[in-house]
Amino acid sequence: CLGIGSCNDFAGCGYAVVCFW
């Protein structure tokens, strides 16, 4: 799962793997 564009939950993973502010 990737959290690109967000540091919040992405795709229901419960965490963001990659965060871009």
Curated annotation (Swiss-Prot):
Recorded superkingdom: Bacteria
UniProt keyword annotations, A-Z: Disulfide bond, Thioether bond
Disulfide bonding pattern of the chain: 1-13, 7-19
Nucleotidyltransferase in keyword set: no
Keyword Disulfide bond listed: yes
Cross-link (3-cysteinyl-aspartic acid (Cys-Asp)): 1-9
Role, per record: Active against HIV-1 virus in vitro.
Name of protein: Tricyclic peptide RP 71955
Species: Streptomyces sp. (strain SP9440)
Lineage, highest ranks first: Bacteria, Bacillati, Actinomycetota, Actinomycetes, Kitasatosporales
